[in-house]
Amino acid sequence: MAFDFKKEYKEFYMPKNKPEIVDVPKANYIAVRGKGNPNEEGGAYQQAISVLYAVAYTLKMSYKTDYKIEGFFEYVVPPLEGFWWQDNVEGVDYTNKSAFNWISVIRLPDFVSKENFDWAVETATKKKKLDCSSAEYLTIDEGMCVQIMHLGSFDDEPATVALMDAYLEQNGYVNDMNGKRLHHEIYISDARKVAPEKWKTVIRHPIKKA
């Protein structure tokens, strides 16, 4: 059986639909940074997703090539994730999608080194005829966070975030979103195949003691 991050790390990928506090360990990611409306057809966000998956699947299938990654084991490509923020806005203004800054990421297995990553970017660019130079090897250390499984459309997230904020207040914590610690979403559902009211999205916010 291929290693599945969602099953092996349920505490980070499959939380309940009520707020909980977690300490998220440091991990490495394929990342592409950008700005703009994620729903724009053929826009920067959709291009970034194409790059992420091109590199992710090149690494996943590397064992079928002459390139060998030390410590490799077969695995399921983890879910797409995103870090989101808007300049000069506290929290997230869901009505102004064109103002979004984002870092889209896919988690890497620990055995993927920077050297392996660089090989995958170069190989994906050649084989898929897609410029993958925007992809970067990014290490993220989230630390203490509050998270919840949001069910439904992205536009309905404010009500879920309000539950998270109330939970923090009751338990002596506050949000700690700043330039380095950001609103984080993990997309468990494939939005192309599942109705919006059934979308599952992990929402995670950095926190600190009040």
Regions found by a protein language model. Give the residues of each.
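A solvent-exposed interaction/effector surface
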Residues: 1-210
